């Protein structure tokens, strides 16, 4: 039990007072619409706030933050709920999904989007003028949370860096209830903290970022039988080392559910899913991926010229909420010994219960500091490993142990830093572990800024950086 669990309920009169100041709905537990606003992607971490504000604009966010400040309550933020690591008990949940403004400036190759926008909406708008954003693997993820956590694009990452590296300005409501327009020039420290520090410093209501003059890429996925994991993984491991920055790739060991929506060869199958995205000609792309394509007979091969609006087809991330447990680590190297460990733990003789364990190439521009620095902590590391298992709390201990076994096996090659957007609930709520996630120097700087911008730790329903 935490201090927030002991906070009193918000009374109907208090909620009504806030509702008189807001244009969006204000909801208490039991109200119609409350449960829908609290729904998130990981059903094992239910949100249970004392009050929900369905913000329609930045003024609603300000009203919610000021209300929380008067009552000494924490504030949490949700657009789609892809990374909610605490239940928000006793707090004010600001739901931004109604804030849907999108403005694409084709001449400047930029977009300004409000906090409730998801990536598919930006992709569709940008494509109309021949541009594309640095969206992630899941097109239904919210732009703001993804970008504030760094933002790893499976298409543009290795050639352009993190999504956070291309942010030009942010509009954010800080703990004092003020709406600030933040740029590298007018508040360089807050700008640095927001991009990588995620939701610890305020509620971002809008952001402006670069777009790229790209309409398609050569990419897709090849599904191999899981029984050929050894050949495919070792081939991919050797192959990726010589790839140009324009090529991005990942490999996932997956045990797929028997869903009718899946093609018959994949239904309930044990597979190795290799994904590719090449920013170049299809002829050159086909030549580059040929060694992996030849590693084993494929079940399905979807690699082709692909519009940027269809980036979700690369990873085929689950589109609906489910109960799951996950873990992640960053690797300094992935030698043959590391590949053999994964084959032992995940291969055809393992009976692994994990739904997916994937390894993504990093490197290239992801290693380089951007022109305007930010707090993204994962530069200089060539791989990120991420795994998840599907199951409710009854299987939680079992699935967590299986995930830990995989991550522990990678320990000889692992770094102590992590990608913030990939943190599990267990990792994100371990205050000592968070210091390692960012590294000592970066964490000290974030802590100092937290004391300045959020001294009471209002924004703590997250991977919390405490003001001390």
Regions found by a protein language model. Give the residues of each.
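Soluble FAD-dependent oxygen oxidases
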Residues: 1-468
